[in-house]
Regions:
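Adenosine-nucleotide cofactor-binding segment
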Residues: 1-42
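Conserved beta-strand segments of alpha/beta enzyme cores
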Residues: 4-5, 77, 103
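Hydrophobic packing within well-folded, soluble alpha/beta domains
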Residues: 6, 18, 30, 47, ...
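Glycine- and other small-residue-rich loops at beta-strand/loop junctions that grip anionic moieties
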Residues: 7, 28-33, 56-57, 81-82, ...
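Glycine-rich phosphate-binding loop and adjacent beta-alpha segment
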Residues: 36-99, 136
């Protein structure tokens, strides 16, 4: 996958680290998949001018963002997800999972400690795996 840097937000301020790594410019693209309010705010703060944010996670509540500084003045482009059946699909999937009709444990083919991230990436490259879970 070619990751040059991996940051654990429990140990460091990811925005400060990203800005330090990019000489204060920020990242070109943010892919926010958790829906976590803090992660979304950090993503916008770490974005470079003219950068792109793809919001793929669904927040559980309203999120306050600094629209002027983090979006408007940066000229950020924001993408969401859409599709007429997206919510219907999610709700159906949730019902199936909650009812125990589908055992997703079979999808998990590997569980590795986080310090074996490189090995996990190599396994993924082979295509000979399902879901790889990294533990900390």
């Amino acid at each position: 996958m070619g990751a040059n840097h991996v940051l654990n937000p429990r140990e460091v301020d990811p925005v400060q680290q990203i800005l330090a790594i990019t000489d204060g410019l920020g990242v070109d693209v943010v892919l926010e998949m958790s829906g976590n309010a803090q992660a979304m705010r950090q993503g916008f703060k770490a974005l470079r001018n003219g950068g792109r944010v793809s919001l793929l996670g669904i927040p559980s509540r309203v999120i306050e963002l600094d629209l002027a500084n983090d979006i408007i003045f940066k000229g950020a482009t924001i993408f969401g997800i859409s599709g007429r059946l997206i919510f219907d699909t999610w709700y159906r999937t949730r019902r199936i999972l909650e009812a125990g009709q589908l055992d997703l444990k079979q999808v998990i083919t590997h569980t590795l400690p986080f310090d074996q991230l490189h090995e996990a990436m190599e396994i993924m490259k082979t295509g000979d795996c399902g879901k790889i879970v990294m533990t900390m």
